[in-house]
Regions:
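Conserved phosphate/anionic-ligand binding catalytic regions in large, soluble enzymes, centered on
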Residues: 73-84, 95-111, 238-255
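Glycine-rich, mobile lid/loop segments that gate access to catalytic sites or pores
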Residues: 115-119, 124-249, 275
Length: 286
């Protein structure tokens, strides 16, 4: 096993061609090693920011099991690196850390099938791109044409995707293809700050920024004919993939609660981790 020094002085022990270890001895207080999955080529990109430092910080978390893991897509994030993975044991002081999930509540990707074939649109691609940029607000500070009242915002929190279907923005089939039919029971709108509601009021129907996207795709290969047939997928079919989240609304909710949990760092003796986005309560805290 060889050892390399990174530009930020983080020691990396090479386990094999695809795994690297940050020893728990790197920082006093680390409960486990850091384990990075990457080859030499990816490692050069990973060296470009302080994501490895975040891998080490996560290793401080109470109840963490086995190792602080980093997947090949690792890059700088909130508390955890993006691409960071950790499991905590609730019977051993395990915690819940918002930084481990990210601030963009309910961020995810949806693949939507259309009734079009590539031949239907191939001569209209430029017009399609212009139309999408014109009709779909995106980017930092973008605001949508969908205006909602304070009451409607609370309905969105409780009903989830069902609210969008009721407004004509989706179909019942969309709900059937969504986890928990688009809404997990138990949402409490009164637990959300007015500041969060203010930030979210003009952002319904917008795409956001960063790595969020709306992409028109074409099926060029099928894997598992029976499964594809059951989903109504065929070669040449046009699909739309959407990656978005809850924008400033979700960010503000998370930020509010992260700040409220700041005292937990000292309460649970996690003084070595000063990065605020790793604030946390234990799973059994009240």
């Amino acid at each position: 096993m060889s050892e390399e020094k990174m530009p930020d002085n983080i020691p990396l022990e090479k386990i094999d061609d695809y795994r690297w270890r940050i020893p728990r001895s790197y920082k006093p207080g680390m409960r486990v090693d850091g384990l990075i999955y990457a080859d030499e080529k990816l490692l050069k990109h990973i060296r470009g920011d302080k994501a490895l430092e975040q891998v080490a910080n996560v290793a401080f978390l109470p109840g963490i099991v086995n190792a602080s893991l980093a997947m090949p897509d690792i890059h700088w994030g909130y508390g955890f690196p993006i691409g960071g993975v950790a499991a905590t044991d609730p019977e051993n002081g395990g915690v819940v850390s918002p930084g481990g999930v990210g601030f963009d509540i309910n961020c995810g990707i949806r693949l939507v099938k259309t009734n079009f074939q590539y031949d239907d649109i191939k001569h209209k691609l430029k017009d399609l791109v212009y139309a999408l940029f014109s009709d779909v607000p995106c980017g930092v500070g973008s605001k949508g044409d969908i205006r909602v009242t304070s009451k409607e915002e609370k309905q969105i929190l409780v009903k989830g995707s069902k609210w969008a279907v009721e407004q004509g923005f989706g179909t019942e089939e969309d709900l059937e293809c969504t986890e928990e039919y688009g809404a997990i029971p138990g949402a409490d709108p009164d637990a959300v700050s007015e500041r969060a509601y203010e930030r979210g009021r003009a952002q319904a129907g917008t795409l956001g920024s960063g790595n969020h996207f709306l992409e028109v795709q074409v099926i060029d290969q099928l894997y598992g004919r029976e499964a594809c047939d059951s989903l109504g997928l065929n070669l040449g079919q046009v699909m739309v993939m959407i990656h978005s989240g809850s924008r400033g609304f979700g960010y503000q909710i998370c930020d509010d609660y992260v700040r409220s949990m700041m005292p937990c760092l000292q309460k649970y003796g996690i003084n070595a981790v000063s990065y605020t986005h790793l604030t946390l309560p234990t799973i059994y805290s009240v």
